[in-house]
From Swiss-Prot:
This is Large ribosomal subunit protein uL15. SUPFAM superfamilies: Ribosomal proteins L15p and L18e. GO terms for cellular component: cytosolic large ribosomal subunit. Belongs to the universal ribosomal protein uL15 family. InterPro entries: Ribosomal_uL15, Ribosomal_uL15/eL18, Ribosomal_uL15/eL18_sf, Ribosomal_uL15_bac-type, Ribosomal_uL15_CS. Keywords: Ribonucleoprotein, Ribosomal protein, RNA-binding, rRNA-binding. GO terms for biological process: translation. Binds to the 23S rRNA.
Length: 170
């Protein structure tokens, strides 16, 4: 067997149909594009939201401004006024607030706000305090202690940038 004897298997290669090249081809006149109209013409079709000339839905909806911050941190909020009946010997922590059902979710940071009055000295540990809450706690003789909160971010990354894989490392 020599190179000039090599042939593809019988029936494995079909000739491509040349459209619009005579009646024998079976694809004459409109060339498989149907009747006339925008879809029969060359070039890209109408834009994605095109509705045949009527005012499209996208234009009829109210215009949305701004953006959604994907790094936003939501807090469980507790007002100073809800700590009035709290025993002074017990520290106020996210765990004790959860046990007394003043907060619902334990995986969220806690912020203390200054709505209401506080008349006993309390040691309050939270992730964030409003300025008025801190002022009311310290005026009552208590302490406002900040806790650190480590935010769990879910990365969409699948490892290093593939375009940088073959780059020279210096």
């Amino acid at each position: 067997m020599k190179l000039h004897d090599l042939r593809p298997a019988e029936g494995s290669h079909r000739k491509r149909k040349r459209i619009g090249r005579g009646h024998g081809s079976g694809k004459v006149k409109t060339g498989g594009k149907g009747m006339m109209g925008q879809k029969a013409r060359s070039g890209p079709g109408p834009y994605r939201t095109f509705e045949g000339g009527q005012n499209r839905l996208v234009k009829r909806m109210p215009f949305k401004r701004g953006f959604t911050n994907k790094f936003r941190v939501e807090y469980e909020v507790v007002n100073v006024g809800s700590l009035v009946d709290w025993p002074t010997e017990l520290e106020v922590t996210p765990e004790t607030l959860l046990a007394r059902r003043l907060v619902r979710r334990k995986k969220m940071p806690v912020k203390i706000l200054g709505d209401g009055e506080l008349n006993q000295p309390l040691v309050i540990k939270a992730h964030k305090f409003s300025a008025s809450a801190r002022q009311k706690i310290e005026a009552a003789g208590g302490k406002a202690i900040d806790l650190t909160w480590i935010v769990e971010r879910h990365s969409r990354s699948r490892g290093p940038n593939p375009s940088m894989r073959n780059a020279r490392q210096s």
